[in-house]
């Protein structure tokens, strides 16, 4: 692809969520969503293969449907109230339609079916954008209108997402699908706490991005799209695979790593709001997620098959210089931030 075209595309992807976050006008929020949607489509279909074309088509159809629902809500709301923002007096049906359409954009269960398939059909670096930056705009809209959300629907979306994210990742061998189901589970945690303490949603999103970025960097460094590829890469880049194991445990929420912080804070806040059943179910599903992360670490580091690969261990000096600095820094942040919990939560 032409470098100038790539610059324009990435700039549009960057500006879309920024416009959405900085707007209180529903129409401008919708414009920001559409900018990021239309800009990422060429990246999804850039690799000329049936799988990438299928991924781009599925992504476009799902996101376009959600965008049409959002635009319909905006028009009907303006017709009823004469305002370009949602109010307490807004029709409940319109609020529920907005919530469901944003759930489709985020990949929350039961509207999650497109996310693993799309992530599986695209390159790792585009998958990183899809699972991190593209989540910011819909979440920012939910954050602005969190007081208007229906708690029942929000709870159903949250608990179903946590269940799907935990169970869906159990039988996967493709690393991109594992990260997709991880994203679904984390979005469920963010949605669960949104009606009660939206600031914890922002904290969870920040830590989720902080954990997902180094995980994808390690996968890209080894070109690892399957668990078997990761296990074969152990004799070449043992330090990177060690960091991968630590990041996976942090993603699973194992104390005392950073990933434990948002789960701890969210469960505490849910208990304060008398949501003991919800918090118990989510804690059980968190253990299930931790199990398949641990199983992934076991399969890629402790079950190495005999190999005739005589290639020498790759020194960190011969790897990408950017990764030499970024990856250790992000790994430290993704493992040792728990002592700052009191400052982060307050």
Swiss-Prot record:
The keyword NAD applies. The lineage of its organism: Eukaryota, Metazoa, Chordata, Craniata, Vertebrata. The keyword NAD applies. GO terms for biological process: mitochondrial electron transport, NADH to ubiquinone; mitochondrial respiratory chain complex I assembly; reactive oxygen species metabolic process; response to hypoxia. Belongs to the complex I subunit 2 family. GO terms for cellular component: mitochondrial inner membrane; respiratory chain complex I. It is a multi-pass membrane protein. Core subunit of the mitochondrial membrane respiratory chain NADH dehydrogenase (Complex I) which catalyzes electron transfer from NADH through the respiratory chain, using ubiquinone as an electron acceptor. Essential for the catalytic activity and assembly of complex I. Keywords: Electron transport, Membrane, Mitochondrion, Mitochondrion inner membrane, NAD, Respiratory chain, Translocase, Transmembrane, Transmembrane helix, Transport, Ubiquinone. This is NADH-ubiquinone oxidoreductase chain 2. Core subunit of respiratory chain NADH dehydrogenase (Complex I) which is composed of 45 different subunits. Interacts with TMEM242. It comes from the Eukaryota. The gene is Mt-nd2. The chain crosses the membrane at residues 25-45, 56-76, 94-114, 122-142, 148-168, 178-198, 200-220, 240-260, 278-298, 325-345.
């Amino acid at each position: 692809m032409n470098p100038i075209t790539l610059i324009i595309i990435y700039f549009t992807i960057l500006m879309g969520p920024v416009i959405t976050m900085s707007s209180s006008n529903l129409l401008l929020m919708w414009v920001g969503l559409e900018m990021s949607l239309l800009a990422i489509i060429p990246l999804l279909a850039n690799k000329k293969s049936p799988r990438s074309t299928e991924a781009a088509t599925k992504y476009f159809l799902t996101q376009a449907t959600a965008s049409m629902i959002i635009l319909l809500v905006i028009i009907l709301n303006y017709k009823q109230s004469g305002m370009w923002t949602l109010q307490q007096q807004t029709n409940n049906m319109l609020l529920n339609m907005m919530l469901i359409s944003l759930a489709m954009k985020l990949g929350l269960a039961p509207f999650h079916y497109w996310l693993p398939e799309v992530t599986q059909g695209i390159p790792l670096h585009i998958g990183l954008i899809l699972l991190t930056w593209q989540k910011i705009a819909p979440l920012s809209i939910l954050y602005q209108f969190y007081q208007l959300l229906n708690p029942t629907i929000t709870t159903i979306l949250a608990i179903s997402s946590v269940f799907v994210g935990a169970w869906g990742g159990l039988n996967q061998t493709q690393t991109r699908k594992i990260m997709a189901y991880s994203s679904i589970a984390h979005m469920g945690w963010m949605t669960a706490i949104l009606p009660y303490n939206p600031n914890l949603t922002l904290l969870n999103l920040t830590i989720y991005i902080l954990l997902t970025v180094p995980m994808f960097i390690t996968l890209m460094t080894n070109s690892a799209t399957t668990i078997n590829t990761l296990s074969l890469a152990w004799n070449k880049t043992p330090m990177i695979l060690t960091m991968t194991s630590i990041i996976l445990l942090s993603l699973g929420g194992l104390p005392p790593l950073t990933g434990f912080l948002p789960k701890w804070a969210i469960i505490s806040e849910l208990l304060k709001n008398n949501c003991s059943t919800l918090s118990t179910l989510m804690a059980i599903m968190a253990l299930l997620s931790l199990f398949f992360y641990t199983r992934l670490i076991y399969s890629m580091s402790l079950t190495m098959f005999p190999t005739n690969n005589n290639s020498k261990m790759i020194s960190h000096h011969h790897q990408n210089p950017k990764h030499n600095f970024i990856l250790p820094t992000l790994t430290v942040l993704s493992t040792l931030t728990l002592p700052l919990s009191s400052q982060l939560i307050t």
